Amino acid sequence: MWLLLIRKYLCIVILLLCIGNKNTDTLITDSLSIYDNHPTLEISEAKYLQWVDSLLGVKDVKLIDYRNGIYQYDDTRFYWNRTFDYFLVYPSSFTHGEESDLGNGNHFVNEDSTICLNVYATYFDVFKDDYSLREWFDMMIDSEVEQGNRIIKKDITDHSYTIEGNTKSGRCFYSKAICKKAYGREIIVTVKLEYMNFIKKQAEKIISMNINHFLYNPLE
């Protein structure tokens, strides 16, 4: 029994590390520099964008920030995490942050920092021998409570969950996690929106248009 408790504690620690060692209130004021100077590519930027166009099935995708996975097509600004192969469309007026050291996610804020959007991925297949997906989801939700957040609404399906509530600092939040395969491995991608209550309508629009349609090619 003690071994199981220790294992569960270690897994929760791993989850918290994947989320990041900063809370969201810090993220919305820290590390928000825009890295528009692309690092040297192994091929020319033009050839790289030709490859992106062919992969996404469109023409004229613009590279905004290679280092942090930011692209634009027409008026659509999106984050493409190449390490875990997922996408997130976000409002073009938002400022993007620096991709995490683990290369698993990024964060985005509006001009006055009243809305913060976080996305990150974790490997699930390494824990399959010890936990079912439902048990892992339960642990992820428990980790929110252990951070001091209050959950007021919860919906769990076979391959995803959605929770809503309030953070310890009094913000509202909406979080969605989905299990998917990336390069033959099972991963869980989590997107979390935190916002002040007085801009709830704008947040609901982001939930409807961006969060509920994330993960896959946004240009299809």
Where do the protein language model's features map onto the residues?
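Bacterial N-terminal signal peptides that target proteins for export
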Residues: 1-10
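N-terminal targeting sequences that direct proteins away from the cytosol to non-cytosolic compartments
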Residues: 2, 19-115, 123, 145-146, ...
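Short, solvent-exposed recognition patches
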Residues: 119-149
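Surface-exposed patches in mature extracellular/periplasmic domains of secreted proteins
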Residues: 151-154
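Short, Gly/Ser/Thr-enriched beta-strand-loop segments that form substrate-interacting elements
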Residues: 159-175
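A short, hydrophobic, proline-anchored segment that marks a local hinge/packing element in signaling
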Residues: 176-181
